[in-house]
């Protein structure tokens, strides 16, 4: 392995959605530095933070149709049975919902939790409440998608928060997705809700750290209890 390959494998790439923000922060740093040199260094630190926020590391995703993988980095904030949002068209019966809260220091690239086919994508405008509170699921701006799998339909909802004001989703109905495939991004703090079809049992608990594309959230027919994810 040459030096270029070593550097490339060491530095975590930045997602293209962040290019314009990183560039804007850097230009602002140059302008501030022209006014007063110490401000340049402050701006440079903020530029580095922006690049860190939009990082897009590679993940090794389990390829098992019996597993539902976390679509987001963050903390498991809720595991409960609720009626899914109407726009998902998943019916009026309660489903198990696992919520993963992302703070401003988490990687915000979202990944498909399962392999399947996108059958519904539904955007709903709303408020920008704290994404950790339960009301955020009903009142906040959100974007939902439904993935049809061999075990039923899995619902995934991107929810904006107080700081997050931009939900990005790249997939469309009838497109296939693989587990761990990038499907969207939410800028600057937010939450992901995952609705489990019948037959899946949660394998995480509230307060546990989740890693997008790696942490097992649920397993089909499982009664084994929580799976501990690695923390990072």
Curated annotation (Swiss-Prot):
Give the record's GO CC terms: plasma membrane
Where is the site Cleavage (non-hydrolytic)?
A: 189-190
Modified positions (Pyruvic acid (Ser)) are 190
GO biological process terms, semicolon-separated: phosphatidylethanolamine biosynthetic process
Reactions catalysed, as given in the entry: a 1,2-diacyl-sn-glycero-3-phospho-L-serine + H(+) = a 1,2-diacyl-sn-glycero-3-phosphoethanolamine + CO2
Co-factor binding comment: Binds 1 pyruvoyl group covalently per subunit.
What Gene Ontology molecular function terms does this protein carry? phosphatidylserine decarboxylase activity
Q: Which InterPro entries match?
A: PS_Dcarbxylase, PSD-A
- PANTHER family, sorted: ARCHAETIDYLSERINE DECARBOXYLASE PROENZYME-RELATED (PTHR35809:SF1)
The protein's name: Phosphatidylserine decarboxylase proenzyme
The organism is Agrobacterium fabrum (strain C58 / ATCC 33970)
Its taxonomic path starts at: Bacteria, Pseudomonadati, Pseudomonadota, Alphaproteobacteria, Hyphomicrobiales
Q: Which gene is annotated as encoding this protein in its UniProt record?
A: psd
């Amino acid at each position: 392995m040459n030096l270029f390959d070593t550097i490339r494998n060491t530095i975590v790439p930045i997602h293209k959605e962040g290019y314009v923000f990183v560039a804007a922060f850097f230009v602002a740093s140059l302008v501030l530095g022209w006014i007063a040199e110490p401000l340049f260094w402050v701006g440079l630190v903020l530029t580095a933070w922006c690049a860190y926020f939009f990082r897009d590391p590679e993940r090794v995703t389990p390829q098992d149709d019996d597993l539902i993988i976390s679509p987001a980095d963050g903390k498991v904030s809720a595991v409960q049975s609720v009626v899914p949002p109407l726009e998902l068209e998943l019916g009026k019966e309660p489903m198990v919902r696992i919520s993963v809260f992302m703070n401003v220091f988490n990687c915000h690239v979202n990944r498909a939790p399962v392999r399947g086919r996108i059958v519904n994508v539904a955007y709903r405008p709303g408020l920008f409440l704290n994404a950790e509170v339960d009301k955020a699921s009903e009142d906040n701006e959100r974007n939902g998608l439904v993935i049809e799998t061999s075990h039923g339909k899995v619902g995934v909802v991107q929810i904006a928060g107080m700081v997050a004001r931009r939900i990005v989703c790249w997939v469309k109905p009838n497109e296939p997705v693989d587990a761990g495939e990038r499907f969207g991004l939410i800028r600057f703090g937010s939450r992901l809700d995952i609705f489990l079809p019948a037959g899946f049992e949660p394998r995480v608990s509230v307060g546990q750290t989740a890693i997008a594309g790696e942490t097992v959230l649920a397993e089909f027919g499982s009664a084994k209890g929580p799976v501990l994810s690695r923390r990072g």
